[in-house]
Amino acid sequence: MRGAVDLDLDWKNAQMECEGGPRPPGKDNKSNGVRVSIGGPDRGKGRRIRLVFGIAGVEEGKDARAAPTNVTILFEGEQRLFATLGDDKCTVDSLTQQRVETLAPNHAIYRVEARGFCLGPATSLTKGERVLLTSFDFAGRVEFDDDDRHALPAKP
């Protein structure tokens, strides 16, 4: 991460909080996919860096390539937030899913592995600062429940 904040993040499994699920449709009712939230190690006094990836067009159990991605970077406890404000600045090059648990019919948990990059910065919503997340890769947990938020919209 470079810009208003210069950091090299190298978080390990036990240090991270990770959860994910279906991404709600966007304004055009077409931008679905998954949302993955990854919180880094506790930095004391309620401070933690959290990255939220909104990956468009990903369906339950299916791999993806070149998926447009919205990225939000939160500095919890510091009142700082950066966002790409759309999925046109970052891309997930490759995403794989492996079912790890079935909780009930139409309710499953997947291990998701993703790798990608950003060509444009995330901007602070209040101060005009910018940061560029040059590249990222992560593995996390995504839970799909008995709903259709992750399914592609029906064609008219």
Give the role of each language-model region.
Residues M1-D88:
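An ectodomain-focused feature that recognizes extracytoplasmic/extracellular
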Residues K62-V142:
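Acidic, glycine-rich flexible loop segments
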